[in-house]
């Protein structure tokens, strides 16, 4: 029997460039003084996201592990999550007292989902620059994720996107499932995501 604490595992997915790594950096910096954190990043042929988070000082370098999937990023978080599960296990054993491990997927499409063996909660990140139509396109990331982040609200005027339309479509597609607009440059919306993690992840118990 493993004698280490079993941390909450939160999968963070979304298309390339939507702001997954920026979200993780912001969450880690905001939560690291309260909780014991670690991160697993996924890239196909590099460990670029691991490098970005390390150089940004999101967490101590030994708390950030990069996984090179070498193929379809969706497979590594769903059909064959063995590399990610091994990384989560190794971090849990190394530190023993982790409260939360974030698992960032490689660039996804709207149909990507995390294996329930890998993630207890899922956050899916899209961004305003993809166009106001993105929420109504649906897909598991938008309709089934535990929390949806619509990032880069500051770009709405430049790409002709209506935040009002995006909000309406998001509520129609998600029903009662929570979501938030964010601008990670200013921190707008970050507190809502943290409150969700603390509540649904029972971190404050």
UniProtKB/Swiss-Prot annotation:
Q: Does the keyword GTP-binding apply?
A: yes
Alphabetically ordered keywords of this record: Chaperone, Cytoplasm, GTP-binding, Nickel insertion, Nucleotide-binding
One GO MF term on file is: nickel cation binding
* GO CC, one annotated term: cytoplasm
Q: Can you tell me which residues bind GTP?
A: 14-21
Is GTP-binding given among the entry's keywords?
yes
Q: Where in the cell is it found?
A: Cytoplasm
Oligomeric and partner information: Homodimer. UreD, UreF and UreG form a complex that acts as a GTP-hydrolysis-dependent molecular chaperone, activating the urease apoprotein by helping to assemble the nickel containing metallocenter of UreC. The UreE protein probably delivers the nickel.
Function per UniProt: Facilitates the functional incorporation of the urease nickel metallocenter. This process requires GTP hydrolysis, probably effectuated by UreG.
The protein's name in its UniProt record: Urease accessory protein UreG
């Amino acid at each position: 029997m493993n004698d280490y604490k079993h941390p909450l595992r939160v999968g963070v997915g979304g298309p390339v460039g939507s702001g997954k790594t920026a979200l993780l950096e912001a969450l880690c910096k905001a939560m690291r003084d309260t909780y014991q954190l670690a991160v697993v990043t996924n890239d196909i042929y590099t460990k670029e996201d691991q490098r970005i988070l390390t150089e940004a000082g999101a967490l101590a370098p030994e708390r950030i592990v990069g996984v090179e999937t070498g193929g379809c990023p969706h497979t590594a978080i769903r059909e064959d999550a063995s590399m990610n599960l091994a990384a989560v296990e190794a971090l849990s054993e190394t530190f023993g007292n982790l409260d939360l491990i974030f698992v960032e997927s490689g660039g996804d499409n709207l149909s990507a989902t995390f294996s329930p063996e890998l993630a207890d909660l899922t956050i899916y990140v899209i961004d305003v620059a993809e166009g106001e139509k993105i929420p109504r396109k649906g897909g598991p990331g938008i309709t089934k994720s535990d929390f949806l982040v619509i990032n880069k609200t500051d770009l709405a005027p430049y790409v002709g996107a209506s935040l009002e339309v995006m909000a309406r479509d998001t509520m129609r597609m998600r029903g009662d499932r929570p979501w938030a607009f964010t601008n990670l440059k200013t921190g707008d919306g970050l507190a809502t995501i943290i409150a969700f993690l603390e509540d649904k992840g029972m971190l404050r118990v």
